[in-house]
Amino acid sequence: MYSLTVYNEPEPGAWPNKTVGLLYDQDMPLTAGRFSCMLGPVRPAGYDGPFIELSDDAHGILTRDYHRDPSAGRRVDWDIEVIDHAGLPAAPDNSDGSVAAALRAALRGARDTLAIAPLVLQERTPAELADGQSLSHNVLAPPYRTGGATYGYSMQDAVYCLGAFALEPDEALVINLTHPACRFWNFTLWNQFMSAVETEYSRSGINCGSAIPNSDGSTTIVIARQLLEHPNALSTKDHAEGLMAFRWFFAADMPEHPSTTVLSVDQAPRTVS
């Protein structure tokens, strides 16, 4: 599954607060293994293919690639061509005023980013943010949809569920849930910068293609600082604290709130049930 999303820029350098347009792979049919789409303020005459209408505040494009098996999948190669630049050269404006404005926007972007990251990893005393997201450790907040309004770069068709882990060397966090019908779901362990804790030597996430379900259709995920024997086990690579995130795309129903239990490593499940 892949997509192309256009976000706005409400002020120079500010994080987006609106999704301008979004196209998924299913919106862009393949012809001889290739697809195309167009972006612009007005749909070109005679063109009836995939199109995103750009608003005056449209600013950035983000592409995404999701694979059930990344080792077997192929990433999308994107070719970008300027068809019409309002009669102007498709070249950056390197005048003093333009460069100064770009530097001011970069400073605003850095300030907005550093106001968020590094994120709070966990709180020993349970707390809740205004949007309902939990700061308690070893729990996940209720799943939520973002819709077209956003702060940052979330996906309007996705459901998110976020939380934090804090584990001792002899502890394991066991997550249980039943997923709704959806095109794709995944679960990822993050550091405080919303990046995978490490991917060079072992996986930091699991998805609908790699997870082994229980006999009743539910999914159990076992997290510990070491890699345990469960087929859906994830290691924090000995990180004592971090973040965790579920995503569901095109979920038929709102996912249930995942349950979490902290057990000793010796008591953690080793097999699916």
Region spans (language model):
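A compositional/structural signature for long, glycine/proline-rich flexible linkers
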Residues: 1-273
